[in-house]
Amino acid sequence: MRLIDTHSHLFLEEFSEDFPQVIERARAAGVTHIFMPNIDSTTIEAMLSACSVYKGYCFPMIGLHPTSVNANYEKELEIVARELKFSKEYVAIGEIGMDLYWDKTYLKEQQIVLDKQVNWALEYDLPIVIHCRDAFDYIYKVLEPYKKTPLRGIFHSLSLIHISEPTRLDVIS
């Protein structure tokens, strides 16, 4: 069986002690690819380093995670834009989306950030990796205008508990 890990933050400090062993166990279990989504500007270097060490096995994605969206989001987006412009090694825009589980303070900003990154996905012809926690209706409102575009990707952490209309799933099919 061939397995693909579509979402792994193994480059984070808490995994550094046994990172090589984790990679070997993943290979032994049949994992053929590991996709690594960025979180914010503080994790780009570690993510790229991990992907460099395991080139052809670990693949970098770039984006601003919704829980990292705050008053400083424009500066973070500038960094993502620069990475996209000057590096061709990114295989997707991620991890992007909305997360209202912990905090709703930056709800509007999360919508703005998601929309901007979806536009980049289309501009650079990259798939998206969407983090959706207690926010499907809001994400739907952002994605709905893109329904007839070549936008593609996957959902991660998809929680449908707060979905208002099941028919809204048509935006993702």
Question: Where on the chain are the PLM-derived regions?
Answer:
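Single conserved hydrophobic/aromatic residue that forms the stacking wall/gate
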Residues: 161-173
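Mid-domain alpha/beta scaffold segments of enzyme catalytic cores
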Residues: 1-164
